Amino acid sequence: MISALGLEEAQSLFQQLPPALRLATLSPVYVAADATRDSALEPVFLCYREENSFWLHSTHRGRVLDTSWHDLQSAYGYGGPVASSDDPAFTARAWSQYREWCRSSGILAEFVRLHPMAGNERFYCGTILDDRMTVAIPLLGTDPEAAFSTRTRRGIGKAARAGVVAEWHAAEDIRNLFPDFYLRAMEALSADPLHLFPAAYFEALSKLPAVRLMVCRKGGEILSMGIFFWGAEIIEYHLGATSTRGKESYSSHLMFKAAADKGRLDGMRWLYMGGGTNGDADSSLLYFKAGFSDSRFPFRIGYQIIDPVAYDNLRKSLIASGRANLKRILFYS
């Protein structure tokens, strides 16, 4: 049977997982914090247990337009279930109970972005699709810079010669310094509104125990900023921004080098950078990240349709009215 847990109990269970699964963005406290970006999102923490084994799914529930249906989807970044057992039979039993919970709870459909570093598709029995490749820098037992390409090392050198310095700031600066700098950078890029966040979001992030803020500056001018999460073994790059002058001085190159150096000192195994803005192999963002490492991890998405008839009827209705986004599983969002 699936149980809905409170945040404290869910986080306590999460802390019992193997270190490789305890990534910050899969934690219940992150999922709860992320829900502050949209008042329509409700964080839910669902658990299946058998003796000493558990399956835990921290996700967001939202209403489907003006219908009586709800959907489930990952927090910003990644999501999907995690479990203390790798037994496929246990996962199958958990999934059967989860499907029943979805049906009885009025869930129409679910969409998840599975974490490349967790490999948690093994705990998800819905439809799984490959999306794109992502990049991570190895840290354990090696100098991180050994994985850098010549062009990346050259950029780091240019930043250092230009007088750029990288420094860690107190978490409170995630709400004090980061938002305005980030917003200006996103406006300059004409970024999708999906990547814009209210003040409450940064307030919530600043209170997470695993969060750290890196600032690169030259003199008094901020050139780059990045939010990173420290998990049990893996650092995750979450959000960042660079000004025009920062790009000219290669400040973001120095930012990732400094984060990797700190991770190595802390005994972390990986610095996860993510992938490109889409699945294109020639993505400029992927090209930048690929300069830091040749280690690749596949990003996969997962979904399930709980009520196919209702799903298809709504889809047809929105297609007829020109309101359906057919590139999305949750075509109404």
Protein language model annotation of sequence segments:
Residues 111, 167, 271-274:
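Short catalytic-loop micro-motif centered on adjacent basic/acidic residues
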Residues 77-89, 140-142, 240-249, 277:
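A short, internal acetyl-CoA/4′-phosphopantetheine-binding micro-motif in the GNAT/acyltransferase core
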Residues 61-78:
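Conserved acyl-donor/pantetheine-binding loop and adjacent beta-alpha core of acyl/acetyltransferases
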Residues 89-131:
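Non-catalytic accessory segments adjacent to catalytic cores
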Residues 41-43, 104-107, 211, 265-268:
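Short, high-confidence coil segments that cap the C-terminus of an alpha-helix
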Residues 4, 61-64, 121-144, 268-333:
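Active-site/acyl-donor-binding loops of N-acyltransferases
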Residues 96-99, 201-313:
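Aromatic (often tryptophan-rich) hydrophobic motifs at membrane interfaces
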Residues 1-66, 114-248:
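A conserved beta-strand-loop-helix scaffold within acyl/acetyltransferase catalytic domains
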